[in-house]
Amino acid sequence: VGSGALTLRRAIIVAAVFEFCGAVFFGSHVTDTIRKGVLDFGDDGFDKELSQDLMYGFMAALLAAAIWLTIATKYGLPVSTTHSIVGGVIGMGLFIQPDSVNWPKVAEIVISWVASPLLGAILAYVSFRIIKKVIFDHDKPLQRTKSLAPILALPTFFVLGLALQFKGLKGFYKNLDNNGIIEKEEWLPCDPAKYSCSSFNPFSDSAWIPLNSFLVALFIGLIASTILWYVLKKYQFKEEGYDGVERVFIWLQIITACYVAFAHGANDVANAIGPMAAIYDIASSSTGILSPDKVDVPIWLLLLGGAGITVGVATWGYKVMDTIGTKITHITPSRGFAAEFGAATTVLIFSMPFLAVPISTTHTLVGAVVGVGLAGGAAAVDFRVFGKIAASWVASLPVAGLGSILFFILFAGNPTNVAIVVLLSIIITIYVVIRADNVDDESLESVITSQPFEQFHEHARAVQKTVECMNNAINSAAKGEDPSKYIEETIALELEADIIKSKIQGEIGSGVRFAIGRDTFLHMLSRQDRIADYAQNVAEQLSFRTLFDDKKARNNLMEMATAVLETVDSYEKAVDSLKELSQSGFSNKEKNLLLECVREVNLKEHRADEIEAKAAAHVFSTGDDDALAAMHMYRVLQRMDDVANACEKAANAFLPSLSR
């Protein structure tokens, strides 16, 4: 959404569909009795008293995690559902039986807070640097994309195919194995508890990547590469240059985003409803004792989990989309694709037996977004936002853990207490939702899909129109005609430019992050707006009285107006070049082109200075008979020179971005 690949509404629909399908149709039908192995009660099994405590403990853990996730999502913090529930389980385990906590497993989870975002950032950084070097630095980026995209699609979709099987379809393969349809060892990475797991050879029994999964992933890669080649061959691009390149990456990003949503639904949702399956197992058991090993996950629980995540995405999902898509760094389709590919590759690596560390897809994706931002320089990343996100990750375990202890105490093993506490929690949550700020779809869409350089370009066009109207006013006055119409239009156009500027300032102030620093961008915007301000001053100066009645002086004035307009036109080309520079990931080629545009603006401004000096000299040499009119003509020339000078300063404000 932040890259503009999909509108907010369409993104919500796509995410909801793939999350739901992943959870319901490919989620695991069997789950561990103690989620992720963070609790270990020994090999003696569970007695009735312990099972009942665990049932209420799991209820408390789920409620605590749900409240924490609600609070975090309300403030747009992308926290891990799985880790929040694990935190709740750890808390209730400490309270019920302190020595039951498997601290080495907890340590693995804590390590994953650093390891998965870090690796995701590195892979996303490298991915985008390769895209930038191979495509954006090329003289003809669109043609380069058409020729290379099918080749790049093969390894990309091969990795996605493996990650989909090992992360998203893991539960599905286990279901088929339980039903005697397949042997899961032939499809999933080998289990370190059963094999040595030391071979890359797909034909080995201890292969990290089994032959079946390898062939399926290769088939997916070949099919995707072939389809992309055919589509690019037939598709008639309306966009040129970098816009056309981003059009290709929009397709790729949508596919990778669908994978992330599907894998999250298939794996993470199943993890989230694991404690609920344990509760159901205890409550439905005739003995009231928890199964010691595995429990079945009823289909209605998978439906419940899928429905829950669908509602979550459709209600407050936009808040997290806003944070990841706009507030961390500037995202385009190519950057978004690199981030999602980096995240998918990280998930694949951590699913290998030589690591086998439980990681969060959410944490990994955030790290990948930071990595893509760093590819454009440290200034492109808002580390304050990332710091808040990281703090929320660290807080997930203790907050959910303490919350589960509190709720477990309030439950007191009494179903009536459970009903009262849960009901009050639901009422409070609904109240918070109702009290949430109402957000208009259109304004929200514009904020989340906001592209600052697009808006900057829109403001530049408004400024250019203001100067063009000012030029018409000057020519009209110089010809002895009434310039009132053009004067009024100039003032109105300057007001429109101010409105656009204020809108941009408001959105930038709301936390949108992009390729250069916020202060630098606002300085550039302010410099650009002064061009329109000075054009308005020229128009107002014309309204004071008629021009100096001298033919050569008036011709000089029109020549000056033409020079000023040419300076503004050159500045507009520099703005176009700045936009291209941003789209290219600040490639060296576009830096050189922008530098040439800035030099051209400076040359045009110097030419305007020369004409202004010539025109002023003529006015002062011939204006003795009507000194007041001559002084008025000089004031008009000065204000016009201000417009040209403002163009020069606005263009020079682009230069710091060339040092990135």
Functional labels for PLM-detected ranges:
Residues 1-443:
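Alpha-helical transmembrane segments and immediately membrane-proximal extracytoplasmic
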